[in-house]
């Protein structure tokens, strides 16, 4: 079940390409326009070099960068849909590929902070999935918590796609939500620096294994004069093994063959370690059909809006003041 990548379309399944886009240095709207041109050029070049590719993925922050002094300013924000997403849609249609792109999205409510958003565009140039990051990387990220849940859409080669953004991938419940809604290929786009490199690799594998689904993950690469972004695009099999692992090179293209039917077959035919099923059917050998209530306190408390850790009252950091953000909520950083 290994993969060394490919230039051609497999007979079944599909070929994916994850682009380790160089971390953008963005100081003006002109720089954003340049990034968009670069992303579109790279999309077309990737299709030309890998003619069988059907899904091309770009990392978080590849469009607008990570200039923390300006990333909340109106100059740096985009709309979804908007002029810029139309350019991406045109490129996907011309190249006849699915594309995954990152957008820092202006909040329709002008009184609140922007969203960190991912979109999937199909080969007809239509936005078929829009996801807003549910778990911003607090306390450093100022994005408003996403309000669209975890959508799933049809993709190439029998795939059902979902996208999470960077820190979302550290939340196992979110990967489980995607799988519970039918996802068999879980995409993660990130702008992480090296502090969490090992944890990135670990969670990409565990998200695959716990849910019997492929994971395809890609991070920015390079140095932005403060942090180094590690690249290391990773494709994991549904059994949690790594099929392809990128390096730390900016512009590296990590490719691999994905066979969604194999993940689907595992979900249907496995007994041992079919854990996404076992969660809701505990002890089904002794009790026909199993016990449907897992008895998990935190799930019940989350559902009731009462989630609270035993040590929560004693925690030192529960707002963004360490990074200079106000603690009153509402729109800031315009």
UniProtKB/Swiss-Prot annotation:
CDD domains listed in its UniProt record: aliphatic_amidase
Signal peptide: none
Catalysed conversion reaction: formamide + H2O = formate + NH4(+)
Keywords: Hydrolase
InterPro entries assigned: Aliph_Amidase/BUP, C-N_Hydrolase, C-N_Hydrolase_sf, Formamidase
Active site: 60 (proton acceptor), 133 (proton donor), 166 (nucleophile)
Entry annotated with the keyword Hydrolase: yes
Record's function text: Is an aliphatic amidase with a restricted substrate specificity, as it only hydrolyzes formamide.
Protein name: Formamidase
Gene name of this polypeptide: amiF
């Amino acid at each position: 079940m290994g993969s060394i990548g490919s230039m051609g379309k497999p007979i079944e399944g599909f070929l994916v390409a994850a682009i380790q886009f160089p971390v953008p240095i963005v100081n003006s709207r002109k720089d954003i326009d340049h990034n968009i041109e670069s992303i579109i050029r790279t999309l077309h070049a990737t299709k030309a070099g890998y003619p069988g590719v059907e899904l091309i993925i770009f990392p978080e922050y590849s469009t607008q960068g990570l200039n923390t002094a300006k990333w909340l300013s109106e100059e740096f924000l985009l709309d979804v849909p908007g002029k810029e997403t139309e350019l991406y849609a045109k490129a996907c249609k011309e190249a006849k590929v699915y594309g995954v792109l990152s957008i820092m999205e202006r909040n329709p409510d002008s009184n609140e902070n922007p969203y960190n958003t991912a979109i999937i565009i199909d080969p007809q140039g239509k936005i078929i999935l829009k996801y807003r990051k549910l778990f911003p990387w607090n306390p450093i990220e100022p994005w408003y918590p996403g309000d669209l849940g975890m959508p799933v859409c049809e993709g190439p080669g029998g795939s059902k796609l979902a996208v999470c953004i960077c820190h979302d991938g550290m939340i196992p419940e979110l990967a489980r939500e995607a799988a519970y809604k039918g996802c068999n290929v879980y995409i993660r786009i990130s702008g992480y620096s090296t502090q969490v490199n090992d944890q990135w690799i670990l969670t990409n594998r565990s998200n695959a294994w716990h849910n019997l689904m492929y994971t395809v993950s890609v991070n920015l690469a390079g140095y932005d004069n403060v942090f180094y972004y590690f690249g290391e695009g990773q494709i994991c099999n549904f059994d949690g093994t790594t099929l392809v692992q990128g390096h730390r090179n900016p512009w590296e293209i990590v490719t691999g063959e994905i066979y969604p039917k194999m993940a689907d077959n595992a979900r249907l035919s496995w007994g041992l370690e079919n854990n996404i099923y076992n969660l809701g059917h505990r002890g089904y050998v002794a009790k026909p059909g199993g016990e449907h209530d897992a008895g998990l306190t935190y799930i019940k408390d989350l559902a009731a809006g009462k989630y609270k850790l035993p040590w929560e009252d004693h925690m030192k950091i529960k707002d963004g003041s360490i990074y200079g953000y106000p603690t009153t909520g509402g729109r800031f950083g315009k």
